[in-house]
């Protein structure tokens, strides 16, 4: 069976494969980030979003994989075989879990559309011959605001990005349209 865990989120394994393996933080760092940002939603019995569900599943898979690796480490007598198993888990399974955790944490943090735009931008950048591409790769946190898809209220015209030079700006602070970290779901 050829199952792509990113398909329902608009991405593919191939799209994530453009990112080098050392791009992804360690599993420990990703788990700490998920816990710090989304612990309440992840532990909640309520359904929050498909990304929360996928993140829960990836975390549970990692816990089970570590349980298996510990068992193998304790029960496999041959050190060479033990090293082969540990290296395989760290190299192959570890990378897949790091990719999954990064993708879903990033989608929850930056928004799915922004992450997909980043993956496409990076994929284009990495496939462009070095002589024809900018020296620095795209950075997720610095993608232009225009990549974020925003809802518009019906019946209202879109707001201007810059005020007219003849008009004074309102004294009230501008509201941010991004989702606050307080509301996890």
UniProtKB/Swiss-Prot annotation:
Self assembles to form an icosahedral capsid. Most capsids appear to be large particles with an icosahedral symmetry of T=4 and consist of 240 copies of capsid protein, though a fraction forms smaller T=3 particles consisting of 180 capsid proteins. Entering capsids are transported along microtubules to the nucleus. Phosphorylation of the capsid is thought to induce exposure of nuclear localization signal in the C-terminal portion of the capsid protein that allows binding to the nuclear pore complex via the importin (karyopherin-) alpha and beta. This is Capsid protein. It is found in: Virion; Host cytoplasm. GO terms for cellular component: host cell; host cell cytoplasm; T=4 icosahedral viral capsid. Keywords: Capsid protein, Cytoplasmic inwards viral transport, DNA-binding, Host cytoplasm, Host-virus interaction, Microtubular inwards viral transport, Phosphoprotein, Repeat, RNA-binding, T=4 icosahedral capsid protein, Viral penetration into host nucleus, Virion, Virus entry into host cell. Sequence repeats lie at residues 157-163, 164-171, 172-179. The modification Phosphoserine is found at residues 157, 164, 172. GO terms for biological process: microtubule-dependent intracellular transport of viral material towards nucleus; symbiont entry into host cell; viral penetration into host nucleus. HAMAP family: HBV_HBEAG (MF_04076). A motif (Bipartite nuclear localization signal) lies at residues 160-177. Residues 149-178 have a biased composition (Basic residues). Homodimerizes, then multimerizes. Interacts with cytosol exposed regions of viral L glycoprotein present in the reticulum-to-Golgi compartment. Interacts with human FLNB. Phosphorylated form interacts with host importin alpha; this interaction depends on the exposure of the NLS, which itself depends upon genome maturation and/or phosphorylation of the capsid protein. Interacts with host NUP153. Residues 136-185 are annotated as: Disordered.
């Amino acid at each position: 069976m050829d199952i792509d865990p990113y398909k329902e989120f608009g991405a593919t394994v191939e799209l994530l494969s453009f990112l080098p393996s050392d791009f992804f933080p360690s599993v420990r760092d990703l788990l700490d980030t998920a816990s710090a940002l989304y612990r309440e939603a992840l532990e909640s019995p309520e359904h929050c979003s498909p990304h929360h569900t996928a993140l829960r599943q990836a975390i549970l898979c990692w816990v089970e994989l570590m349980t298996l690796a510990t068992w193998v480490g304790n029960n496999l007598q041959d050190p060479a075989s033990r090293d082969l198993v540990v290296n395989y888990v760290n190299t192959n399974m570890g990378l897949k879990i790091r990719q999954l955790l990064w993708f879903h944490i990033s989608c929850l943090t930056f928004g799915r559309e922004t992450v997909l735009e980043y993956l496409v931008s990076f994929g284009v950048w990495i496939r462009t011959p070095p002589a024809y591409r900018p020296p620095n790769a795209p950075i997720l946190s610095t993608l232009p605001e225009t990549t974020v898809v925003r809802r518009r209220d019906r019946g209202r015209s879109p707001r201007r990005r810059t005020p007219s030079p003849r008009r004074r700006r309102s004294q009230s602070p501008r509201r941010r349209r991004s989702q606050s970290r307080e509301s996890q779901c």
